[in-house]
Amino acid sequence: AKLGKNIEVISRARIEINAMRLAVLQAAKAMDVLGNKEARVYVSAVKAMVPEKVCEIIDAAIQMHGATGISQWTPLATMYTDMRHLRFADGPDEVHHMVVGRAELQKYDVW
C-alpha cells in the first residue's frame, strides 16, 4: 500500500463504499416513508450500483495483489465469483437501469 497508485485505489474504494452505503440508506428511508412501490426507483438504483461497484473494488484488489489475488491464498477470487453471481440474483443490471432511466425521463416529461 506504500505505492502511490495503490493508495489512490484504496481511496477510491473507500469513497465508493461510502456512496453505496448512503444510497442503501436512502433506499431504505424511501421504503419506510414512501412505501415499497414508490421506493422502487431507489431500490433499483441500489440493485444496479452496489454489485457492480463491489465487483470493481474486488477486481482492483485482485490487481493490487497480482497473481496472488486469483490464488486460493486470498479470499478475493471467491469474493469476486460470489459477487458476480449476486449480480444475476435480482435480475439483469439493465432492468434496474431501465427503471431508473424511465423515472428520470418522467421527471422532465420526456417519457
PLM segments and residue spans:
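Alpha-helical interface subdomain recognition
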Residues: 1-111
